[in-house]
Amino acid sequence: PIERIDQKLKAIEQTIRSYTNNNFQNRKIRSAGVVSSSKLNVINKLYGLSIGDTVQITESMFNDGLYTVKGIEENTIVLDKELIDEGHILITKVEYPDDVIECCINLCEWEVKNRGKVGIKAETLSRHSVTYFDQDASNQMNGYPVSLLGCLKPYRKARC
């Protein structure tokens, strides 16, 4: 089902953000705002923000997180999830470089093809034998082979 795919993509996105310690925010497309009637009213119009873009809300008591833009009318932004009314938030556009998106696609493909084989070291059927890559703590991160996460190395930021 589509909900399962959406959930898996969100989990992979969170894995990438956690692994790199990078929130991929475009701070040039940012504004303070308020939430009223589940709509986000920004102080400054966000030029460069479009329907379908990912945004991150921070400095919020109730609404911190990642959202998808569903609608924009002047200084009002409609997001994909209900928001709780509050007097101050900060909204910033999130932009992932193409090679990070490619890495996400590779993780999705690995998930589909190999997740069920994790923990199986070898299989033998009649005279046919297959040995799988052994995944242990030294060569995996967040459940994925380190080799798949190598493309994220340029985006890793030091933790404070």
Regions found by a protein language model. Name each.
Residues P1-E102, R115, S138-C160:
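Conserved short "hinge" loops at termini or chain/domain junctions
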Residues C108:
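Short Cys/His-centered divalent metal-binding micro-motifs
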Residues R127:
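Conserved, mostly hydrophobic/aromatic
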Residues K113-K121:
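Short acidic, Pro/Gly- and aromatic-enriched capping/linker segments at domain boundaries
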